[in-house]
UniProtKB/Swiss-Prot annotation:
SUPFAM superfamilies in UniProt: N-terminal domain of the delta subunit of the F1F0-ATP synthase
Native species: Cyanidium caldarium
Topology in membrane: Peripheral membrane protein
Localization annotation: Plastid, Chloroplast thylakoid membrane
Pfam family for this entry, one: OSCP
General function of this protein: F(1)F(0) ATP synthase produces ATP from ADP in the presence of a proton or sodium gradient. F-type ATPases consist of two structural domains, F(1) containing the extramembraneous catalytic core and F(0) containing the membrane proton channel, linked together by a central stalk and a peripheral stalk. During catalysis, ATP synthesis in the catalytic domain of F(1) is coupled via a rotary mechanism of the central stalk subunits to proton translocation.
Subunit structure: F-type ATPases have 2 components, F(1) - the catalytic core - and F(0) - the membrane proton channel. F(1) has five subunits: alpha(3), beta(3), gamma(1), delta(1), epsilon(1). CF(0) has four main subunits: a(1), b(1), b'(1) and c(10-14). The alpha and beta chains form an alternating ring which encloses part of the gamma chain. F(1) is attached to F(0) by a central stalk formed by the gamma and epsilon chains, while a peripheral stalk is formed by the delta, b and b' chains.
Recorded GO MF terms: proton-transporting ATP synthase activity, rotational mechanism
HAMAP family for the chain: ATP_synth_delta_bact
Entry protein name: ATP synthase subunit delta, chloroplastic
Record family assignment: Belongs to the ATPase delta chain family.
GO cellular component: chloroplast thylakoid membrane; proton-transporting ATP synthase complex
């Protein structure tokens, strides 16, 4: 729990700063795409991630490598931000910072990020209907639905929005029924 609180105290200020810069420069999407590309690259190349996170390697050397590799791909604002993360020994949080930045952008656009775990893929019509219900319930202009197929739910789905979980799955109903039986 303490580690989680410490991480959020680190992640939020950096993601807020990046959001503020992106807003001033009107580069929400460019920076979002850059951060996602960088995060994907570091996740897929484990050696590169270890290189960046190793405190024994000189920070200037890390920054030089990042700039050499990404200078033609990433926006200069994004590169400078990543350099700051390296300088402040915060590069290990880049994935979390990127995720929080994306949430701030969506919030600014009055878009709610909704993760949906379902037993099978919903049809386009079902997804649209669910989207309309969620927009009305959470009073927002738009919702961004991210689906994750989880066959163990049997039927129905779970909705994760902000800190809320709405479980309308058969698995959830069975667990609740089991709880009543064992009570």
């Amino acid at each position: 729990m303490i580690l989680l609180l410490t991480n959020s105290k680190i992640i939020y200020p950096y993601s807020e700063a990046l959001f503020s810069i992106a807003k001033d420069q009107e580069k929400f999407e460019v920076i979002k795409n850059d951060m996602e590309l960088f995060v994907t690259f570091t996740k897929n190349l484990n050696g590169f991630k270890k290189f960046l996170e190793t405190p024994l390697i000189n920070k200037n050397k890390k920054i030089k490598v990042v700039k050499d590799v990404f200078s033609k791909i990433l926006n200069s604002t994004t590169l400078n931000f990543i350099s700051i993360l390296i300088n402040k020994n915060r590069i290990m949080f880049v994935s979390n910072i990127s995720e929080k930045y994306n949430q701030l952008v969506l919030k600014d656009k009055s878009v709610k990020l909704v993760k949906i775990a379902c037993a099978r893929q919903l049809s386009e019509k079902q997804a649209q209907a669910l989207s309309e219900v969620l927009k009305h319930k959470f009073k927002c202009l738009s919702v961004k639905l991210i689906f994750n197929i989880e066959p163990e739910l049997i039927a129905g789905f779970k909705i994760f929005i902000e800190s809320q979980v709405i479980d309308v799955s058969l698995q959830g109903e069975l667990k609740e029924f089991e709880w009543y039986l064992t009570k």
